[in-house]
Amino acid sequence: LDFFRTEETEGNKKRQKEILEQHIDIAVEFNKPLMIHCRNAYDDMLAIIAQKKKEHGDVLRGNIHFFAGTWNTAQKFLALNFTLSFTGVITFTRDYDEVIKNVPLEMIMTETDCPYVTPVPYRGKRNEPAYVVEVVKKIAKVRNKDVEEIKTAILANVKRVFNIQDK
């Protein structure tokens, strides 16, 4: 759901919600995780996921892309067993430190959201996938952990969420 760039009419919101619900049903049918884009719509998203969880149980799983909410909102997504993904924005604002400190490490993922929100020290340049390491470094710093420990945990999280098996 993205209520930021669209005209916020009830018709537009309703249509987005209907399509999201269809998408959730398809993901569950094929046992695939959801990658959730949610902007200016956390309450609506939480309500839909909670309702669909009642219908589908733990087969419904996924990740909240570019999580930019509060610790209170994070807890609600975590209770639904959705991981939270952090971007380069965490490297240039302290607004997310509380969330990063409190989210269980096994529920954290990282991303770049290329070409936007380039992390420090690359601000002003086009974002690239290679810069995700800066997001990992920031998480390690905020949590007072070793970067390798964070990398290892995030890799395990990705494998779990996407059901990737080691060969």
Which residue ranges define each predicted feature?
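Divalent metal-binding pocket/active-site signature
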Residues: 1-80, 98-103, 122-127, 144-147, ...
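Mid-to-C-terminal alpha-helical segments outside catalytic/metal-binding sites
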Residues: 26, 131-167
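Active-site neighborhood of phospho(di)ester-bond hydrolases with catalytic His/Asp-centered motifs
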Residues: 35-36, 63-64, 86-87, 109-112
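Generic structural signal for helix capping and beta-alpha/helix-loop junctions
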Residues: 44, 94, 117-118
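Short, acidic/turn-prone active-site loops that include or flank metal/cofactor-
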Residues: 68, 88-92, 114-116
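Active-site glycine- and acidic-residue-rich loops that bind
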Residues: 83-97
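Active-site phosphate/pyrophosphate- and oxyanion-stabilizing loops and adjacent acidic/basic residues
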Residues: 97-98, 137
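Short acidic/histidine-rich active-site segments
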Residues: 106-128
